[in-house]
């Protein structure tokens, strides 16, 4: 798949690809956003709008802006990858989540991913996290044994966990906590990807290099 403003990203196994800068994903007006992979419709909620920064991104106000997805039926996955670009402008805010609890959030002194609501949590300290106001490429992969975290295309560490991820009948939401509706994201949101496989370290780097000239 040709990435907006750059070379190809890995497209094998893609379930979700959303990009405000692509006409295939957003026309530039209205509230309907298309998943480029299956043409399913996501909806801009409240005052969330596209801005021209970085070729087209979403401007979340931190109050009530978010994107709501349809009910997806991706099944039970033994491996997957979640990846996104974002520029956070304040702490303690969510960017991507689903209900139940597969989610990221930015804390005052940590960055967190939860796999399946229990276990699979991974923290790293603020002195190696991406500062406020800076674009970051965040990736979590699950291969059936470990959740691995990548930042700016670089491996950060892993958390051992087992089992499968039930992505059947889930509603993905971008910009808020899917369960409670809190932790509203404040900042700019870029491309969002979900794969039905665990990307390798080389594939994570490939995707980062394909789009870094747009976002960094």
Features from the language model and the residues they span:
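Extracellular/lumenal ectodomain signal focusing on beta-strand-rich modules
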Residues: 17-20, 137, 191
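Short proline/glycine- and polar residue-rich coil/turn motifs
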Residues: 128-132, 164-165
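Extracellular glycan-recognition modules
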Residues: 27-29, 45, 61-119, 130-132, ...
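Extracytoplasmic low-complexity segments
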Residues: 1-64, 204-216
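Short, solvent-exposed beta-strand-to-loop segments that form ligand-recognition rims
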Residues: 151-171
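Extracellular/periplasmic catalytic domains that process cell-envelope and extracellular macromolecules
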Residues: 8-11, 50-52, 75-77, 105, ...
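Extracellular glycan-interaction patches encoded by glycine-rich segments
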Residues: 1, 118-119, 168-190
């Amino acid at each position: 798949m040709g990435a907006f403003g750059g070379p190809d990203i890995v497209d094998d196994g893609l379930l979700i690809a959303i990009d405000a800068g692509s006409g295939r994903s957003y026309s530039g007006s209205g509230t309907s956003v298309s998943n480029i992979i299956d043409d399913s419709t996501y909806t801009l909620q409240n005052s969330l709008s596209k801005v021209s920064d970085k070729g087209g991104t979403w401007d979340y106000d931190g109050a009530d802006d978010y994107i709501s997805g349809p009910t997806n039926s991706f099944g039970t996955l033994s491996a997957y990858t979640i990846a996104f670009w974002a520029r956070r402008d304040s702490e303690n805010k969510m960017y991507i989540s689903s209900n139940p609890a597969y989610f990221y959030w930015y804390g005052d002194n940590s960055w967190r991913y939860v796999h399946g609501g229990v276990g699979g949590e991974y923290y790293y300290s603020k002195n190696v996290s991406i500062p406020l106001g800076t674009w970051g490429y965040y990736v979590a992969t699950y291969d059936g044994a470990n959740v691995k975290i990548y930042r700016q295309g670089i491996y950060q560490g892993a958390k051992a966990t087992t089992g499968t991820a039930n992505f059947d009948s889930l509603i993905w939401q971008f910009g808020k906590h899917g369960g409670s509706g809190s932790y509203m994201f404040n900042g700019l949101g870029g491309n969002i990807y979900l794969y039905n496989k665990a990307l390798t370290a080389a594939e994570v780097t490939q995707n980062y290099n394909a789009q870094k000239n747009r976002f960094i």
